[in-house]
Amino acid sequence: MSFTIAIIGRPNVGKSTLFNRLVGQKLALVDDMPGVTRDRREGEAKLHDLHFTIIDTAGLDEGPKGSLTARMQEQTETAIALADALFFVIDARVGLTPADRAFADFARRADKPVLLLANKSEGKHGELGAMESYALGLGDPIQISAEHGEGMGELYDALSKIVPPSDDEDDEREETDEERASRPIRVAIVGRPNAGKSTLINHLLGEERLLTSPEAGTTRDSIAVEVEWKGRGFRIFDTAGLRRRSRIEEKLEKLSVADALRAVRFAEVVVLMLDAQNRFEEQDLRIADLVEREGRALVLAVNKWDLMEAQPGQISALRRDADHWLPQITGAPIVAVSGLMGEGIDRLMQAIVEAYAVWNRRVPTAALNRWFEGAIANNPPPAVSGRRLKLNYITQTKARPPSFVLFCSRADAIPQSYLRYLVNSMRETFELPGTPVRITLREKANPFAHKRKRPN
C-alpha cells in the first residue's frame, strides 16, 4: 500500500492548493472562501522522486453534531486515521489563531509524524508568521508557498526522511553529516539562453547527452543528469535559458521557463552561468535575485573565458563587479570556465561542494553570542525618537540557508540598513559567502504590558 499523507488544518490555509500542486493537476476546487473542500479527496502525488498518496481534507473546524461542519470534521478524522503522516498547514500571513493552537493538539494526539507547513510565507509578513508557528511545538516550520511553488525543495528534504523508499526500510533519523555526504548534491545550472550550460554539462559527462547549438533556446526542458566527481555524487539540472518576460512568446517556452524555475526551487546550489563577453546584464541580476529569494547557495560561473584576452586583474575586477551588482549575496564564489575547452571544471565542482557546506552551516551558540555582543558594541542600534532600540538576543532557527531570529524591543523601528550591517558582519565573521543569510526580527514579549497601573 502506498505511503499516505493527510493535509490538515483550519479552513482557507491553502490545503487544496498544495494538494493540486503535489498531484500535478487541478483535482481540488480552490477558492478564497473558507470551507470550499467539503469531503476528502485522494490523489497520487509526486515530489521529485518521492511517490505517495495525498489526502485533501476539509478544514478542521468545530460545529454542532450532525451539522455539515461536524461531518466535515468527521471526514478529516477519518483521513488522519488512514494516513501514515500529516501535513499540518497554517497561514503564515495571518499568523497563529486559536483554532491553529487547538488543532495542533489534535494533530499531536494522532501520534504520527507531523510536518508543520507555514503556507503563504512569501514576503515579510509570511516570514514573521512562520517564526510564530514555533509556538505550536510541532518542530521547525517549513516555509512554503503552495500557489507559487516556493519551498518545495525544503519540503522534499523533510519528506524524504518520512516517505520510505520503494524497497528499503524507513529511516526517520535526522540526516547526519555522513548521510548528507552520501546523497547527491542537487545543482541547477541557470542563465540566459546560449550561455553555455549544456556544453558545460556535456563536458562533465564526456558525451553529447544534451543537445547544444549556437541558437539560443535549444534546451526546452529541465533535464537532470547524474555526475560523479572525486567520489561525490551530483544531480545536475540543465535548464532552459531564463529570458526577459517580454520575450517569452510561445506557450512551449513559457512552460520551459516555469520548468527552469522549478529546478531552482528543487536545487540546493545554483550555478549562474555568465557570458564572459557580456556579463551582468539585467536578466542575470534578476536570476540571481530569484536564487536569493528561494534561499539557495549561489556560484557564479563565467563561461567562454577562453575567448577573453589575458589581462592582469580580470578576476579581481570581476569580484568587485559581482559584489556591486549582487549585494544580497555578497562573496558568491566566482569561477572562470570554458565549457567548450573543459577548463576550470575542477574549480567549479570544488566551489559547488564548498557552497553546499556553507549553505548547511550551523553556527555554534557560544560563537554566535560572542559575535552578537561584539557587533552591537562596535555599532549600536540607532536611537528612535530619542530612545535607544534594545536588541535582546539572537538564535539560529535553521540551516539551508542559515536563518536566525533576533529578539528586540521594537521590530518595526529597526532600519533595513542596520539589518544589512548585521548580515554583512555575520557573513564576514562566520565565512558565509554566496549563501542567503536570513535574520527575522521578533519582539520580545513585555511581561508588564497587560498589567494595569496602580491607582495613585
UniProtKB/Swiss-Prot annotation:
Extent of Acidic residues compositional bias: 166-178
Domain of life of the organism encoding this protein: Bacteria
Stretch list, region Disordered: 162-181
Binding residues for GTP 1: 9-16, 56-60, 119-122
GO molecular function: GTP binding
Key word Hydrolase present: no
InterPro entries: G_ENGA (IPR031166), GTP-bd (IPR006073), GTPase_Der (IPR016484), KH_dom-like (IPR032859), KH_dom-like_a/b (IPR015946), P-loop_NTPase (IPR027417), Small_GTP-bd (IPR005225)
Pfam families: KH_dom-like (PF14714), MMR_HSR1 (PF01926)
Biological process according to GO: ribosome biogenesis
Domain (KH-like) ranges: 361-445
Coiled-coil residues: none
CDD domains on file: EngA1, EngA2
Keywords attached to this entry: GTP-binding, Nucleotide-binding, Repeat, Ribosome biogenesis
Keyword tRNA processing: no
Residues that bind GTP 2: 191-198, 238-242, 303-306
Role noted for this protein: GTPase that plays an essential role in the late steps of ribosome biogenesis.
HAMAP family noted in UniProt: GTPase_Der
Family assignment from sequence similarity: Belongs to the TRAFAC class TrmE-Era-EngA-EngB-Septin-like GTPase superfamily. EngA (Der) GTPase family.
Subunit structure, as described in the record: Associates with the 50S ribosomal subunit.
This protein's name: GTPase Der
Source taxonomy: Bacteria, Pseudomonadati, Pseudomonadota, Alphaproteobacteria, Hyphomicrobiales
Gene: der
